[in-house]
Amino acid sequence: MRVLSVDHVSYTYPQQNMPAVNDVDFSLERGSYTAVVGLNGSGKSTLARILCGLLDADCGEVSYASGVRSALVFQSPKDQIICSVVFRDTAFGPQNLALPPDEVELRTIESLAVVGLLHKASSPSVTLSLGQTQKEALAGIIAIDPDVIILDEALSMLDPDSKNDIFAFLSYWIRKGRTVVHITHDIDAIRKAQDVIAMEKGKIVYSGTTDDFFTDTELCERITGEKIVKSVFKKNNKNAMKFSAVSNMPDAEAARRTIVC
């Protein structure tokens, strides 16, 4: 089932001559994981903002299937932190969906457990490290359970173990039928994806499977700016970690509290 269609979308920033996004056209299916890749200035972050409605395209159309909800996780996590305490901030989204208090609490605990911040639930947000703040922002998005999640370099500040935990969750999430769009230039992140959309100067120059993208070494190196060793590449999800049920977390009960924001 198609969840997102991008129909010949273009966007030029005010007082700029060249479009940041130029005649971009693609569609995404439910349960897919697509990496949107390119060097700085290629237009991928601008595209992310158009997909989430933060920017209006000059021409073309972005359309979601009926009832589909999308969410964006920014590269700078502080742009998304609203409340002063980690638990309250993560609960903010579910609360504004008018969910029952028990459901808000459950989603908040599960989301913090997924990103490895359950032990920081009662901590002030300002006391977190930059990497932990990025996890907090991601937890807040996970808690609203969007159908499409757009990650704009949102894992760039995480350590390798934390990244693996998030990738494991995303793999589980995709199996539930959710769709992931990952704006990135990180080779490891690209390898986790099923498909790749490569951008240069605002245009799509490649759209296809991850395997085929890495097979075209010249294109891959030009788009990522990295030297690619073919023998190192492994097909997607080979290293995916198994998702651990949140109910098994020993400190989950300790995080339960009255949610006020």
Feature map (PLM): residue ranges:
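Conserved beta-strand-loop-alpha-helix hinge in the C-terminal portion
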Residues: 203-226
